[in-house]
Amino acid sequence: MTSNNGIIMNLDNQYLIDINEKILKRHAKIKKVKVYIETTKNIDLVIPKVNSVGNSGNRKEDLIEKVACIMAVIPWAQAFFDSNRRTGIIAASKFLYDNGYELEIDPDNENLELRGMLSEIKKQSQTLNQDLMKQLSFYISKRIKPL
């Protein structure tokens, strides 16, 4: 599906479920631990929330806003029993790739910063904290690069 500003939106609940399952199976294999691959009813909050943002008509700004939303809504909504932050990061990266961009993130230092922001977002109970969303959007805007 493509929006009016040319943004390709190939994310749906099943795609997110598949990403989460792959992450958890890999984790189980590497760590030799039992994992629980389950979704919650909150998964139904993710795609409508992503579709509600990034509709200004400025493609790059809209992409950044949607990527921030994908990364934030999954851990905030606790769409899965485990690996919500990792699922959000990978789904957002795939979304960017589909739209001709990538995030340049140093796997050591910057990933910790990103995971810290997503942890703070997860702690919000009622609504997404707009200050944290702006901080996340700024973080993404400094690291988004064309393929």
Model regions: which residues?
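FIC/Doc superfamily catalytic core
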Residues: 1-147
